[in-house]
Amino acid sequence: MNYSMDVEAVFWKEGELFALTKRFRGRETNLFKLSKLDSEANNEFQLVQKIDFDDEVTAADYAFGKLAVLTYKSLWIFNDDETVDMFDGEISHYEFEADQVESVTFIDSETVMIVEESGEIYRLKL
C-alpha cells in the first residue's frame, strides 16, 4: 500500500483540486494538487508541499480566501495570501476536545461547522 497517497481531505481552489493525506509514517502531511481534470486521460496529482500538523488530518475546506484544515484535536485556518506556499499566510489555530471529528465546512467568512462521526455538530466563530 502506498501510504504517501492516503487522502483524507480534498478541497477545490480556483479550478484546481487539492488533496491532503493522512500521515501514517512520520509527522508530515502531504499536499497534492491536480491541475487538469481530463476524463480521457490518467490524471496525476503533483506534490505541492509538506506540513507538520499536530495530528492526523481528517477534513478540509476552502472558501472566502481561507483554508480550514481539521485534525482530531484542532482546527487550522490559513488566510490565503496568494503565494505559492498555501500554508505561508496568517494562521489561526484552535484546539479542542472531541471524540472523532471528521468534517469541516465554512458557513460564512467568520464561522465554520465541525461534525463528529457520531453526529455531534459544533459551530466555531473564528
Name each model-derived stretch:
Residues 1-126:
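Sequence/structural signature of beta-propeller domains
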